[in-house]
């Protein structure tokens, strides 16, 4: 996370994880395009199909929409990723779980300022304070980021604040308090057509300047995690949270082209941990209840050249999502070599929307499902195991996915909403191997196959508005491989490779009709078409030299990705690419100060490539270009009191 990295986007650590694609749009107004095994690739913003958790507090709300802008990498200690069948027990997320943990304070007290500058006017600075005294462990971090942006009309300013306090209350009780906040203001460069990309990859897309497309976000959330031991074999954990998020977004359209969204979200996850012996066999059990709710007040206005104007077509909706889930998971060890795991989760999610003006309400819909997983693990030897797992998943639409009808996105007129979208259901099988080879190498290999019915796919995207529909059958299958090696001469090597075949498995028809019945567009999405927004291959490789006695470190990074489709028809795509990065770090100790400097050059060979796409963009503005050769340099210092 911290070794010569920008510590700017969660894509930095995630690119080292096989199965995860975190495509950087170079657009802070739209977030990263994150997918896990192809799930989440259809998200128009934020993280969809992936559960986000930060210090035990969910970053994913009741309807399954996740936000990542509040993740503070400057104070993150680790980022854990769970993929496949085990992730279904986390609820409304079929693809995986991203769990971020902040650093813990070290004994005494430490103050650590940091500063970095880079290409395209990038400037980041902040201060981190941590320590531990009298059974109180604390971390406080405040950071600011500015960038002029790689593309025209893409500058951004972001401030992150993160607080973590852990109180040790006696021998059996601990209380962790979490609070974080993000303030973001970003211009939106939109996507480019193929012709625009060829002409000027750094230009803003059509409509960005005339509508002054942009986004501002203010989010604050807090929570606590109470851990209470109830004896030698039992532990109770309760984690309530509460937060609010205010978003104002100017889209590249006139009518309803300004969205003012206020969201309140809250909930609690409580679970019981139990260890026992069953017939002389070790047994672990976790059972819990997870309840969440988010309430949105959504206003829209007309975007007149970047100014918000009231109009008769303005929307005024009160929207709500709530879920109440029960889950249980057990692990039995019949022998030292065998581990058996099973779990089930009952989910109940309701989405509703009421109009506060003369426009019609969108109605309500309740989704219910029981999902589960089974896994068998066999230890060939102490540090090597093979496993097979099965899991079923459940993925409801978000409030954002039901707000627009396809005909409204394409033609305007009356918006009837899209409350009738079904939940996607997934059956997934995985086999794999995990091995630590001697003391110098580690290798993980996994093969997976996931069948989805009623997959939620993008019907159309235009002017910042996106409409969705169900695809009858899709499939995602692939290979994931990761390895790490300690080599002679103080060298270390690592690799993460993904091969993904994500395709439609049953032909379906998309029909989009305007308010005038004579204007209808109908087309076929054929079986065998690729699911857009996700590459068919991905590779991250690194060779690092580190000299322990003087703190010097040099590394070469290689990144490559296969092509990705930009629309369901597979009539547009972005070519694959390969780039190389270099980084260097130096560390010193001067008096009570620990100092480190770093510098990195990304895309050393100055390759031109597309970093991300806007799936099914109605005006063919699919492409979001990535930077050419660029640099970043910074310094960190820490003083212990």
Predicted features along the sequence, with ranges:
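Short acidic/polar hinge/loop motifs at secondary-structure boundaries
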Residues: 10-13, 41, 49-50, 57-83
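A beta-strand signature from Gram-negative outer-membrane beta-barrel systems
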Residues: 61, 70-114
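Transmembrane beta-barrel wall of Gram-negative outer-membrane proteins
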Residues: 110, 117-146, 151-189, 214-231, ...
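Membrane-embedded beta-barrel scaffold of Gram-negative outer-membrane proteins
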Residues: 136, 229, 235-249, 379, ...
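Conserved C-terminal beta-signal and adjacent last beta-strands/turns
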Residues: 168, 180, 328, 388, ...
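Face-selective signature of the C-terminal outer-membrane beta-barrel domain
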Residues: 172-182, 216-356, 379, 444-447, ...
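Surface-exposed extracellular loop regions of Gram-negative outer-membrane beta-barrel proteins
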Residues: 185-198, 293-306, 348-355, 364, ...
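Gram-negative outer-membrane beta-barrel transporters
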Residues: 272-274, 335-340, 348, 442-451, ...
């Amino acid at each position: 996370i911290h070794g010569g990295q920008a510590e700017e986007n969660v894509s930095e650590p995630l690119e080292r994880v096989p199965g995860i694609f975190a495509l950087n749009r170079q657009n802070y107004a739209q977030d990263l395009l994150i997918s896990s095994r192809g799930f989440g690739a259809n998200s128009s913003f934020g993280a969809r199909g992936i559960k986000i958790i930060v210090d035990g507090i969910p970053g994913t709300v009741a309807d399954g929409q996740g936000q990542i802008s509040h993740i503070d990498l400057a104070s993150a200690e680790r980022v854990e990723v769970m993929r496949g069948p085990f992730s279904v027990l986390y609820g409304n997320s079929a693809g995986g779980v991203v769990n971020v943990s902040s650093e813990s304070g070290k004994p005494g007290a430490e103050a650590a300022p940091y500063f970095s500058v880079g290409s395209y006017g990038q400037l980041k600075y902040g201060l981190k304070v941590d320590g531990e005294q009298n059974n109180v462990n604390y971390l406080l971090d405040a950071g600011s980021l500015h960038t002029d942006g790689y593309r025209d009309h893409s500058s951004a300013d972001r401030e992150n604040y993160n607080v973590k306090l852990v109180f040790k209350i006696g021998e059996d009780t601990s209380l962790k308090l979490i609070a974080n906040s993000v303030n973001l203001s970003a211009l939106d460069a939109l996507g480019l057509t193929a012709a625009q990309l060829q002409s000027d990859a750094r230009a803003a897309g059509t409509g960005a300047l005339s509508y002054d497309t942009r986004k501002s976000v203010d989010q604050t959330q807090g929570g606590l995690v109470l851990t209470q031991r109830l004896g030698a074999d039992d532990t109770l954990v309760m984690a309530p949270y509460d937060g609010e998020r205010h978003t104002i977004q100017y889209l590249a359209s006139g009518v309803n082209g300004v969205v003012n969204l206020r969201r309140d979200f809250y909930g609690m996850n409580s679970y019981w941990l139990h260890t026992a012996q069953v017939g002389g066999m070790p047994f672990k059990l976790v059972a819990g209840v997870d309840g969440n709710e988010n309430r949105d007040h959504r206003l829209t206005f007309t975007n007149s050249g970047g100014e918000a104007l009231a109009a008769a077509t303005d929307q005024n909706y009160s929207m709500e999502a709530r879920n109440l889930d029960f889950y249980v998971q057990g692990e039995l060890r019949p022998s030292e070599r065998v581990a058996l795991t099973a779990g089930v989760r009952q989910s109940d999610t309701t989405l509703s929307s009421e109009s506060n003006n003369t426009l019609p309400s969108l109605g309500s819909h309740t989704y219910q499902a029981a999902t589960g997983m089974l896994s068998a693990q066999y230890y060939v030897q102490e540090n090597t195991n093979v496993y097979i797992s099965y899991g079923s998943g459940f993925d409801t639409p978000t409030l954002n996915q039901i707000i627009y009808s396809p005909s409204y996105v394409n033609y305007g007129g009356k918006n009837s909403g899209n409350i009738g979208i079904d939940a996607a259901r997934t059956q997934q099988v995985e086999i794999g191997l995990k091995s630590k080879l001697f003391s110098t190498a580690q290798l993980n290999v996994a093969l997976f196959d996931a069948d989805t019915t009623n997959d939620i796919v993008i019907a159309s995207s235009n002017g910042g508005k996106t409409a969705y529909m169900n695809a009858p059958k899709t499939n995602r299958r692939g290979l994931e491989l990761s390895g790490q090696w300690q080599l002679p001469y103080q060298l270390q090597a690592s690799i993460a490779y993904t091969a993904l075949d994500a395709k439609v498995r049953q032909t379906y028809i998309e029909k989009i009709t305007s308010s005038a019945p004579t204007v209808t567009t109908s087309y076929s999405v054929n079986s065998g078409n690729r699911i857009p927004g996700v590459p068919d291959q991905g590779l991250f490789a690194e060779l690092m030299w580190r000299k322990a006695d003087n703190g010097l470190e040099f590394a070469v990074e290689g990144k490559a990705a296969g092509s990705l489709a930009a629309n369901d028809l597979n009539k547009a795509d972005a070519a694959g690419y390969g780039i190389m990065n270099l980084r260097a770090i130096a560390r010193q100790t001067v008096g009570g100060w620990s100092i480190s400097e770093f510098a990195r050059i990304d895309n050393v060979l100055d390759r031109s490539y597309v970093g991300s796409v806007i799936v099914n963009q109605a005006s063919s503005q699919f492409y979001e270009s990535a930077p050419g050769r660029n640099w970043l340099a910074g310094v960190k210092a820490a003083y212990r009191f």
